[in-house]
């Protein structure tokens, strides 16, 4: 599911303190 994938990306980005994923 694409939505789940996007959530995963945001999770990883937030965990690394990186904000590179924006809609």
UniProtKB/Swiss-Prot annotation:
Organism annotation: Trimeresurus stejnegeri
Cofactor detail note: Binds 1 Ca(2+) ion.
Cofactors demanded by this protein: Ca(2+)
Keyword presence, NAD: no
Family: Belongs to the phospholipase A2 family. Group II subfamily.
Highest taxon of the lineage: Eukaryota
Enzyme class: hydrolase
GO terms for biological process, alphabetical: lipid catabolic process
Lineage: Eukaryota, Metazoa, Chordata, Craniata, Vertebrata
Alphabetical UniProt keywords: Calcium, Disulfide bond, Hemostasis impairing toxin, Hydrolase, Lipid degradation, Lipid metabolism, Metal-binding, Platelet aggregation inhibiting toxin, Secreted, Toxin
Role: Snake venom phospholipase A2 (PLA2) that shows a moderate inhibition of ADP-induced human platelet aggregation when tested on platelet rich plasma. Exhibits moderate hydrolytic activities and prefers the anionic micelles (dPPC with deoxycholate) to the zwitterionic micelles (dPPC with Triton X-100). PLA2 catalyzes the calcium-dependent hydrolysis of the 2-acyl groups in 3-sn-phosphoglycerides.
A GO CC term assigned to this protein in UniProt: extracellular region
Intracellular or extracellular location(s): Secreted
Reactions this protein catalyses: a 1,2-diacyl-sn-glycero-3-phosphocholine + H2O = a 1-acyl-sn-glycero-3-phosphocholine + a fatty acid + H(+)
Protein name: Acidic phospholipase A2 CTs-A2
Enzyme Commission code(s) on record: 3.1.1.4
Sample GO molecular function, one term: toxin activity
Keyword presence, Cell division: no
Expression sites by tissue: Expressed by the venom gland.
């Amino acid at each position: 599911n694409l939505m789940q994938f996007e959530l995963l990306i945001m999770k990883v980005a937030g965990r690394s303190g990186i904000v590179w994923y924006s809609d």
